A protein has these predicted regions:
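Active-site metal-binding loops of divalent metal-dependent hydrolases
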Residues: 66
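Residue-level marker for buried hydrophobic side chains located in beta-strands
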Residues: 60-62
Length: 153
């Protein structure tokens, strides 16, 4: 699974910086069906509900780039489609959109599992914190899209 999901080593330094010392359980995912994503999301939600009060605050996080190596205009268009499904808390819609639009979102599976878990935990809304692409830092013809989204439950 690590071949397709390298988000742990990308996010871990940020988490260590913000949280200091903490315990975490990484889940590295590769190819799962929509049903497997739903089942795993529900299992994560069950563990969250069972353990959250016992161990203190549990934070669930998923990490992914959005579109890869496209023009800024095309990246913004495709990212907007994926973000629409994410902000609607629509895991099947995200999978469908990424497949139908051929969006190169490398973490679509972890994001889908996260959305299923969030919905199982009663999430009602997601909020876009920031959306940008690598061309926002320096002009370039091909960019990678990024976004941060908060989901409260």
């Amino acid at each position: 699974p690590h071949l397709h999901d390298h988000s742990i080593e990308v996010q871990l330094p940020f988490l260590q910086r913000v949280l200091g010392e903490f315990t975490f359980l990484p889940i590295s995912l590769s190819h799962l069906s929509a049903e497997e994503c739903r089942e795993l999301g529900q299992a994560i939600a069950q563990v969250y509900e069972a353990e959250n009060s016992a161990v203190g605050k549990i934070v669930l996080a998923a990490s992914s780039d959005l579109s890869h190596y496209l023009s800024p205009k095309e990246t913004e268009r495709l990212d907007a489609l994926a973000l629409e499904a994410i902000l609607a808390l629509d895991p099947p819609g995200l999978l469908r959109t990424v497949e139908e639009e051929n969006i190169s979102m490398c973490g679509v599976i972890p994001t889908t599992v996260f959305l299923f878990a969030a919905k199982a935990l009663g999430a009602k809304q997601a909020r876009l914190l920031k959306h940008c692409h690598s061309g926002d830092v320096a002009p370039m013809r091909e960019v990678v899209g990024y976004a941060s989204v908060a989901v409260e439950f």
